[in-house]
Amino acid sequence: MGDTIVEPAPLKPTSEPAPGPPGNNGGSLLSVITEGVGELSVIDPEVAQKACQEVLEKVKLLHGGVAISSRGTPLELVNGDGVDSEIRCLDDPPAQIREEEDEMGATVASGTAKGARRRRQNNSAKQSWLLRLFESKLFDISMAISYLYNSKEPGVQAYIGNRLFCFRNEDVDFYLPQLLNMYIHMDEDVGDAIKPYIVHRCRQSINFSLQCALLLGAYSSDMHISTQRHSRGTKLRKLILSDELKPAHRKRELPSLSPAPDTGLSPSKRTHQRSKSDATASISLSSNLKRTASNPKVENEDEELSSSTESIDNSFSSPVRLAPEREFIKSLMAIGKRLATLPTKEQKTQRLISELSLLNHKLPARVWLPTAGFDHHVVRVPHTQAVVLNSKDKAPYLIYVEVLECENFDTTSVPARIPENRIRSTRSVENLPECGITHEQRAGSFSTVPNYDNDDEAWSVDDIGELQVELPEVHTNSCDNISQFSVDSITSQESKEPVFIAAGDIRRRLSEQLAHTPTAFKRDPEDPSAVALKEPWQEKVRRIREGSPYGHLPNWRLLSVIVKCGDDLRQELLAFQVLKQLQSIWEQERVPLWIKPYKILVISADSGMIEPVVNAVSIHQVKKQSQLSLLDYFLQEHGSYTTEAFLSAQRNFVQSCAGYCLGCYLLQVKDRHNGNILLDAEGHIIHIDFGFILSSSPRNLGFETSAFKLTTEFVDVMGGLDGDMFNYYKMLMLQGLIAARKHMDKVVQIVEIMQQGSQLPCFHGSSTIRNLKERFHMSMTEEQLQLLVEQMVDGSMRSITTKLYDGFQYLTNGIM
């Protein structure tokens, strides 16, 4: 064998660990690379073998025949054989080397040989410790991304690329922007290490494929047009958009038209059988998103159609895997662009409702909302519930989307279309007395719309939206009260124990709940979103479900999304990642700070979707609608100072304010007017709109100079400067900063990798990363940090620029 290293045996698609301990011929060295990294069934054999060979060949070239043991220690291969008795760990120099070194005297040649051996020994030790780190439990996805970005060794990069297969999908998905940005803008070795994982996941998940295609397009847009056309990012995007990465199991199932054998699995787990509605849904809004047939005969004969040859169209032979979803997204973006041309909010709202009504004719279809965290099909958009959001120059809008949850998007048939007037047939059931009908029984039937009166016109489709605006109060039936008390009495009799109830406590709690029910906002033509956002989410879900022809289905869900056109959401995505990382750090360090990062979908360099924050309205809307100070609004919503509800809301306010103050300080978030700060029903504040972070500011003026926004109104809610909650706020700030700087590298690398090849304004200037690191104050003691926090809090609270900027926003945009 000479000095050759044993070739690793190819990986088999099995979940069993790599065979054999070191020294057992085939597979021994492969186990070095894969030992302790989890299930191997997801690792592509060629990828693993290539990575293994590159690592071992690199080690061999550097160290002249030195391999690595399964323990991660460097081994000297005597005569090329990996025999245990002849393997020596180089952590301690072998006796032969020590004897040779003693014999080497004053000659230059002998000195050179001695230095070479020492360098070889040191390099081997470094390789030993590196591999030990890679195989340890401490090696997480954050460290993998760091080594992939910083390492210049192709072998290490290949190993990390292979190791990606062993992390959880959701962990890798968090760093997808970083992985794709490295693929686009870094050298070929990094790209070659990343690509196998991306291709593998694209075959597994259509949603992952969509996000990769969108991000590759958005991050390639910063390149010169001639370079972009031939870049590796553009080529990978074209590969994803083609049907070459369609899951293999779908291709194999195409010829089969007969029903799958009943194996005891649920229908969604059996082999997918195309129905007519499924087939037609693969066509777009113009040619790919075509609605399912609305013929009642078709809708009632799904089982017949599932095995019919007429259910097959040419969608399988043409590259349309992502086409319906892309057309769906294009339609939503086109609506936003058309709305921006209209002068008034009222006109925009009317046009939005009309556009969405037309879009409903194309649904259900094989489309989904990428911001959701579960598989589903979009079946309906309740168009009358959509609202246009506040924006001076653009027209972002909020829509609610009805979906049917499914186990697997690729293999589940598209639901059949249910006509809007189908809801009329439920009237007769509604007239039945409710006594004796459980909540679950009502939810499982079509009878979900309250019987308001006997006027048939109340059920017309055109009037559903009006009925949904202001629902009359639903009075509890007397028989419901009887049933409830009967259950209570039976329970107490079975216990055979006397039940003592503090009547005073009951009266106090009931009076608090009745007196401090959350207030509703009035309709404002200039701000139509205020009423929609103020309505409690659960109430909105119930109301929309009652008016939906799909609401009776048990897997019905309601989602919401904000559609933005003309805005670059890549900075928003970067801010989301940093805040999400900070949230994880504080949870790990058990610091009770509260922030709520919301999901961002980058569609292009100037469009995207945002996950709305439910049960929350902006402080501007609060002040405009209530005409109260922030503290008085808290008292109105949650009760007096001593009530449990107020104290809980106050604590939530303090914990969230401290969390966002730290996040805004580290990211240098600007444009902090009251329209960009939300207040939820539980008292938390949530910052939104991170279009100006790090090196960028509105109009590049750098006007907001304070570390973060902390107004006297915020301090009043905390109980004033001398209050315990204000001291608690400063303590949380200190604890949060100490915890964050322990994990500084995890935060900094998110930003540093995205700076590669980027033209985003937040990266203008050469000192962006250096300034970010300085804000962690790594050289300060905890006592010095405490003094720093005191200074930042005091400076932000007294900042004249914050007051001037709020005044400027009020004068120019009417933001209170």
Curated annotation (Swiss-Prot):
Instruction: List Phosphothreonine occurrences by residue.
Output: 263, 438, 517, 519
Q: Give the matching Pfam families.
A: PI3_PI4_kinase, PI4KB-PIK1_PIK
| Segments of this protein annotated with the region Disordered | 1-30, 101-120, 248-318
Per the UniProt record, which EC number(s) apply here? 2.7.1.67
- The region called Interaction with ACBD3 is annotated at 2-68
Q: What class of enzyme is it?
A: transferase
> Which SUPFAM superfamilies does the record match to this protein?
Protein kinase-like (PK-like) (SSF56112)
Asked whether the keyword Lipid metabolism is assigned, the reply is yes
Q: Provide the PIK helical domain boundaries.
A: 29-242
Task: Enumerate the residue ranges of region (Activation loop).
Answer: 687-711
Record field: compositional bias (Polar residues): 278-297, 306-318
Q: InterPro entries from the xrefs?
A: Kinase-like_dom_sf, PI3/4_kinase_cat_dom, PI3/4_kinase_cat_sf, PI3/4_kinase_CS, PI3K_accessory_dom, PI4KB-PIK1_PIK, PI_Kinase
Q: Which residues carry this modification: Phosphoserine?
A: 258, 266, 275, 277, 284, 294, 428, 511
Mind listing the UniProt keywords for this protein, alphabetically?
Acetylation, ATP-binding, Endoplasmic reticulum, Golgi apparatus, Kinase, Lipid metabolism, Membrane, Mitochondrion, Mitochondrion outer membrane, Nucleotide-binding, Phosphoprotein, Transferase
Q: Where is the PI3K/PI4K catalytic domain?
A: 535-801
Q: Where in the cell is it found?
A: Endomembrane system; Mitochondrion outer membrane; Rough endoplasmic reticulum membrane; Golgi apparatus
* Chain spans, region Catalytic loop: 668-676
User: Which GO CC annotations does the UniProt entry carry?
Assistant: cytoplasm; Golgi membrane; membrane; mitochondrial outer membrane; rough endoplasmic reticulum membrane
Query: Which portions of the sequence form the region G-loop?
Result: 541-547
Q: Name one GO molecular function term.
A: ATP binding
- What does it catalyze? a 1,2-diacyl-sn-glycero-3-phospho-(1D-myo-inositol) + ATP = a 1,2-diacyl-sn-glycero-3-phospho-(1D-myo-inositol 4-phosphate) + ADP + H(+)
Q: Per its Swiss-Prot or TrEMBL record, what regulates the activity?
A: Inhibited by wortmannin. Increased kinase activity upon interaction with NCS1/FREQ.
Family statement: Belongs to the PI3/PI4-kinase family. Type III PI4K subfamily.
What does the UniProt function comment say about this protein? Phosphorylates phosphatidylinositol (PI) in the first committed step in the production of the second messenger inositol-1,4,5,-trisphosphate (PIP). May regulate Golgi disintegration/reorganization during mitosis, possibly via its phosphorylation. Involved in Golgi-to-plasma membrane trafficking.
The record ties this protein, via PANTHER family, to:
PHOSPHATIDYLINOSITOL 4-KINASE BETA, PHOSPHATIDYLINOSITOL KINASE
Q: What is the recorded name of this protein?
A: Phosphatidylinositol 4-kinase beta
- Species the sequence originates in: Bos taurus (Bovine)
Q: What is this protein's gene name?
A: PI4KB
